[in-house]
Amino acid sequence: MEKIKIVTDSTCDLPEYIISKFDIEVLPLMVNVKGKSYFDIVDINFKQLSKIMDEENIFPTTSQVTPKRFNDCFAKYLKEGYKIICINMSSKMSGTYQSACIAKDMLESEDVVVIDSLNVTSGLGVLVLKACRLREEGKSFEEIKNEIIETIPHVKSALAFERLDNLIKGGRLSKTAGTIGNLLGIKLILEVKDGEMAIKDKVRGNKKAARVVLDCIKDESMNKEETTLLLNAENDDILPILRQKLIEQENKFIECEVGCVVGAHSGTKACGVFFIEKY
């Protein structure tokens, strides 16, 4: 039986117990704030980062995983006899995928495959979880690679943002539009589309925001064989509604805390759902 190692980056935002359970190798991105650099999740979590951002009124930057770190990781597992499936955040949002490709080319090994998820946070997470499930089922290296690539267009998402301040600071939303949105109580519903964050809807109030996200997770559209991920950035309003809906529909789901890279843009009080649709 093939030894297969699943590798990803820290933007997958999977809980530590899941990472340990499936022995996933997670390479953290760097978070740069106040002249210091931290490994995402390892050295700093979102709650700590959020506190710094609020108190200092600053916005952090992030750095991709370097080719050398991928090279060291791949070389280690190849030496141990593994074949490696590396699934990374969207190439349109970070150079991390390209770093992994450079590392693969340096090693000149056919036993390493690098996949662009065209997603981020729990959208990347659901693909990593599927790869782990397929491995547990005894699927081959080639079968897992092909199934993950086939699944990528079928990952769906909806994220509700309570405040727009961090989107403004991060340049994802104009200052004028964001300020007006905050004043009017407008909630942005975003989705990951074609590898980038896109506005799905604009509504006023938490109830309408919850309704838009709920419409995305209708029972008939979701593949219940796959695990749905419920992403939380300290949200106490919409998240319980989404959780209850998934329980009622008997969906398998895992709750995940947002990491620093995505959380820097979402801010607190955001939440979202990521799943694989039927196809």
UniProtKB/Swiss-Prot annotation:
Family annotation (PROSITE patterns): DEGV
Entry keyword set: Lipid-binding
Any one GO MF annotation of this record: lipid binding
Binding locations of hexadecanoate: T62, S94
Domain DegV: 4-277
Signal sequence bounds: none
PANTHER family for this protein: DEGV DOMAIN-CONTAINING PROTEIN DR_1986-RELATED, FATTY ACID-BINDING PROTEIN TM_1468
Main function: May bind long-chain fatty acids, such as palmitate, and may play a role in lipid transport or fatty acid metabolism.
Protein name from the UniProt record: DegV domain-containing protein CA_C0701
